[in-house]
Amino acid sequence: MSKSGTIRSGMGGWTFEPWDTSFYPDKLPKAKQLQYASRQVPSIEVNGTYYSSFKEPTFVKWASEAPDGFVYSLKGNRFVTNRRVLGEAGESMLRFLGSGVAALGDKLGPILWQFAPTKKFDPDDFEAFLKLLPEKQDGVALRHALEVRNDSFIVQEFAALARKYKAAIVYADHAKYPDIADVTGDFIYARLQTGSDDNPDCYTPKGLDEWAARARIWAEGKQPADLRRVDPATDAPVQPRDVFVYFITEGKVRAPFGAMALMKRLAD
């Protein structure tokens, strides 16, 4: 068995007007942007699936345009997570997962379930949601990541539930939202959201060095000592884990360069 999992870094999406003149080659047709982007970074988080519904031909097209080894993380549709009673999300979840996501095949990465900042932790209702998460869709294995954005989740019980259902808690490097570094699944999902367009590589060189070091620790199956855990008494099994690190939101113009700079550090 490999001593480390695979580390992939990327950004959110591939269509963003400022990238037309900063990231993409001059005069590159928009129809070629995905092909180009997927050859500069090994993964992309797709935000469009949160707002819109797509059909199988779209996922087939995305799979065909990206190279072998590339992985898409998909943000789960908002109708699944933006509801008062999470335990009633089953129909919406089945509709989203059954829309054709499995057509991505081995290019399907984690499904990111993002919860509203107003959604507070209700143990019973949240467990009812976790029980709905399927292990497979049309024969393709699914990996689930949970991004919570309310401080009420900073409790041991949340980490215990995520661990019970083998879902990964998203680590958010964010100015306002909770940062929870407990390892609860067999992969790691981090969203880096405090970058700046004033930095050529989104984060400072020191910040990128620190995130590269943490990514290596995670990939080896360990846990960075400098990140907060809500249940520090419970250690995850030491085993290789794939790591997904995305540069999101703040510093978006420079996000692709942050992802590439991080991958360069990891290759050195």
Set out the residue ranges of the language-model regions.
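Residues lining hydrophobic/aromatic ligand-binding pockets adjacent to catalytic sites
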Residues: 1-268
